[in-house]
A protein has these predicted regions:
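A ligand-binding cleft/hinge motif common to bilobed small-molecule-binding domains
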Residues: 95-96, 113-120, 170-171, 200-233
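C-terminal motif of bacterial Sec signal peptides marking the signal peptidase cleavage site
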Residues: 15-18
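Periplasmic-binding protein-like
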Residues: 53, 130-137, 219-257, 274-281
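Short helix-initiation/N-cap motifs at beta->coil->alpha
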Residues: 88-99, 143-144, 183-197, 235
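Bilobed "Venus flytrap"/periplasmic-binding protein-like clamshell domains
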Residues: 54-56, 68-81, 113, 135-191, ...
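Bacterial signal peptide processing site
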Residues: 20-23
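Extracytoplasmic small-molecule ligand-binding "clamshell" domains
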Residues: 28-112, 262, 271
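Acidic, polar ligand-binding/catalytic clefts
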Residues: 77, 86-149
Length: 281
């Protein structure tokens, strides 16, 4: 009943144009087409989702087989299923996802898109997860690090050049020295796998990166790491629809609410190591 109700809401809201990648066959089989829709949508029964072809784990990326996978992909499929539609992912470079939406080649963007004021001028957002910075430490020797605080004073950490993690580490190091404590020994490497290996080998005490990236490595790769404290410097990520497309925006919000209520949302985030970035917290 809920699928039919939501499908009625979006009947006039979803655009159908442009080219896209093939959708998940199992989702197509289980959900079927929208029960109520204009002729074009009734024939296709599709929710076109803009996704980046240059994304990163765990949000949206290509696995070793070339398939599009990730937490946002799974959320997109689940939202489409709640709407009674099958998902069809329209891939483009990240920089082109908003123009692709504006050209009506897709209906909604799910592409690690931060909710920022300048973007809210052209799209409407349904927030579904946070992004933030996290601290990875060794499971065996966590070095008494508790988060972005004075427990980092005098510790050797690794960051990537030009990242939020780098600037926040520098700020915390200055706080350490101002308090008469040793500063943070900040080292730089742009390869997360190398940095995490150094954490596990005891060459550095911690590696700072996006919390979602660290959660992915801890959950999906078997890395012997854990996150110290909670993510910080967080910002919301949202599903973006064309400005003023209220029917589709509201339908996606309702679908997400139902995914939160039935536990699907939490299950997806847990599978991808993003439970600590839930919008429900």
């Amino acid at each position: 009943v809920k699928k039919i109700a939501i499908a009625c809401v979006i009947a006039g809201a979803v655009a159908l144009s442009g080219c896209s990648s093939s959708s998940d066959e199992s989702t197509r089989t289980s959900t079927g087409p929208a029960k109520v829709a204009p002729p074009a949508i009734l024939q296709a029964g599709t929710l076109k989702i803009c996704a980046p072809n240059d994304g990163t784990p765990p949000s949206v990326y290509h696995d070793e087989t070339g398939a599009l996978v990730g937490s946002e992909v799974d959320l997109g499929k689940a939202i489409a299923a709640k709407l009674g539609l099958k998902p069809d992912f329209v891939e483009s470079a990240f920089a082109a996802v908003i123009p692709t939406l504006q050209a009506k080649q897709c209906d909604v963007i799910m592409a690690q898109l931060y909710i920022k004021p300048e973007r809210e001028k052209v799209v409407d957002f349904v927030p579904y997860v946070y992004s933030g910075t996290g601290i990875a430490v060794s499971k065996e020797t966590p070095a008494n690090i508790t988060g972005m605080d004075d427990s980092l004073c005098g510790k050797k950490v690794m960051v990537a050049v030009g990242t939020t993690a780098e600037s926040l580490s520098q700020e915390q190091s200055e706080k350490c020295t101002a308090a008469g404590k040793p500063g943070i020994d900040i080292n730089r490497n742009n390869h997360a796998d190398v940095s995490l290996q150094q954490v596990q080998n005891g060459q550095v005490d911690a590696f700072l990166d996006t919390a979602e990236t660290l959660g992915y490595y801890a959950t999906k790769t078997g890395a012997r790491i854990q996150l110290a404290g909670q993510p910080f410097g967080t910002i919301k990520i949202g599903a973006a629809t064309l400005k003023g497309n209220t029917e589709l925006h509201n339908a996606i919000q309702q679908a997400l609410n139902e995914l939160e209520t039935d536990g699907t949302y939490a299950k997806i985030l847990d599978q991808w190591g993003q439970s600590n970035l839930s919008i429900q917290k």
